[in-house]
Amino acid sequence: MRLEKSLVLIKPDAVERNLIGKILEVYEGAGLKIKAMEMKQINKEFAEKHYEEHRDKQFFNSLIKYITRSPLVALILEGEDAINKIRSLNGATNPEKAEFGTIRRRFALSGTENSVHASDSIESAEKEIKLWFPKVFYEEICG
């Protein structure tokens, strides 16, 4: 297996409830390495760019309002099969359908306030890392 990188967001609901450490503990306990991490307060335009594939969905405006309401933590995690591993640790988007022990089952408040986001493919990871961490992306690609 090869090393993969994934963007992960610890969303506002989790930050507001002081869950950053508990969530990071899950990822690190699974052998994932933090390659970059930053607390950010994003604006509407940035959020719309990140969630552009959801623009036509009915939940789009409430999602943008939620993700911009207070700071979040953006990080790049790296590990073997990182994308699948992280998605498994996170659990289903809807916390009621997430498996017991997953981050969303343990901490999420709702389908929108679901505590974490993670890239769902290598392609989305590259796109999201480039958006959230352009300097890191540039250094990785251009050396």
From Swiss-Prot:
Residue stretches spanning the membrane: none
Cofactor(s) needed by this chain: Mg(2+)
Reactions mediated catalytically: a 2'-deoxyribonucleoside 5'-diphosphate + ATP = a 2'-deoxyribonucleoside 5'-triphosphate + ADP; a ribonucleoside 5'-diphosphate + ATP = a ribonucleoside 5'-triphosphate + ADP
Enzyme nomenclature, EC number: 2.7.4.6
Entry's Gene Ontology cellular component terms: cytoplasm
Gene Ontology BP annotations: CTP biosynthetic process; GTP biosynthetic process; UTP biosynthetic process
Keyword Coiled coil: no
Residues engaged in binding ATP: K11, F59, R87, T93, R104, N114
Record-level Gene Ontology MF annotations: ATP binding; metal ion binding; nucleoside diphosphate kinase activity
SMART domains linked to this entry: NDK (SM00562)
Description of how the protein assembles with itself and partners: Homotetramer.
General function of this protein: Major role in the synthesis of nucleoside triphosphates other than ATP. The ATP gamma phosphate is transferred to the NDP beta phosphate via a ping-pong mechanism, using a phosphorylated active-site intermediate.
Protein name (record): Nucleoside diphosphate kinase
